[in-house]
């Protein structure tokens, strides 16, 4: 289920698979696939992705986007990027791209409500 409200055209800093969490690239206007929970992620690649560096890529920046799940996820959990740009559950002290709209397991394509933020440390 998706409801993409805001898409931003960027250039790929490297190949980006479809439905992957992305972060800013090395230059303005470029995006690369997310690689860690500490990344400053800003959206999710669309169904086309990008096959090589400098290819155009549309990034879903607002609304509900389809995203590749990289672990077991329960709807409502905050999601962050694993090493492959797939969605995994964000824990204390990690950044997140948004919240799961549906439950799923690794290999599923789920949905994320895009609302970037940070999970505070316990007691913070």
Regions found by a protein language model. Name each.
Residues 1-124:
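Surface-exposed, low-hydrophobicity beta-strand/loop segments enriched in small/polar/acidic residues
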């Amino acid at each position: 289920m998706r409801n993409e409200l805001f898409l931003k055209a960027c250039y790929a800093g490297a190949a980006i698979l479809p439905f992957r969490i992305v972060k800013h690239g090395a230059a303005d206007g470029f995006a690369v696939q997310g690689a860690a929970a500490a990344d400053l992620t800003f959206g999710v690649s669309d169904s086309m992705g990008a096959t090589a560096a400098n290819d155009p890529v549309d990034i879903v920046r607002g609304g509900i986007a389809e995203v590749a799940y990289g672990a077991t996820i329960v709807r409502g959990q905050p999601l962050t990027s694993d090493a492959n740009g797939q969605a995994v559950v964000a824990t204390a002290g990690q950044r997140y791209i948004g919240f799961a709209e549906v439950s799923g397991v690794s290999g599923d394509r789920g949905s994320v409500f895009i609302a970037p933020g940070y999970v505070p440390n316990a007691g913070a």
